[in-house]
């Protein structure tokens, strides 16, 4: 019974570490990804060694269930850490002057454009925001432009501009 619980525990550690390693690699943080990869491999070998010592159906099922639960836990950890930034496009029918000002007052850098949509003139705002501030930004948009269309992208790299100063919360 002790080994079964150990297998489950190791999987609940292993998969979130795997998740974090993948995120760090995608975000370009290769040194941190390498450290997570080393830890991930140690846990993997240790857990598999325990399973192979006693090839019971229960051990294999617990290993698989632990992996599935680890994915859920890894996703939860990823959402809580919210590492990185999002580039958000806000599309509106009317020129959103008040929203633009509120965003700037709240420390966001905003670039706005006018374009031609199928049914007439449309406006697009480009806003770079830390993922930890996404909920706050969505609420701000919802308050001022409830019918706005939002699209979020994960930028791989960026440099310069107001962005660097604007990513911090206003004091």
Curated annotation (Swiss-Prot):
It is found in: Cell membrane. The chain crosses the membrane at residues 4-24, 32-52, 57-77. The keyword Flavoprotein does not apply. GO terms for cellular component: plasma membrane. It is a multi-pass membrane protein. It comes from the Bacteria. InterPro entries: DUF2179 (IPR019264), DUF5698 (IPR044035), UPF0316 (IPR022930). Keywords: Cell membrane, Membrane, Transmembrane, Transmembrane helix. Belongs to the UPF0316 family. This is UPF0316 protein EAT1b_0871. It comes from Exiguobacterium sp. (strain ATCC BAA-1283 / AT1b). The lineage of its organism: Bacteria, Bacillati, Bacillota, Bacilli, Bacillales.
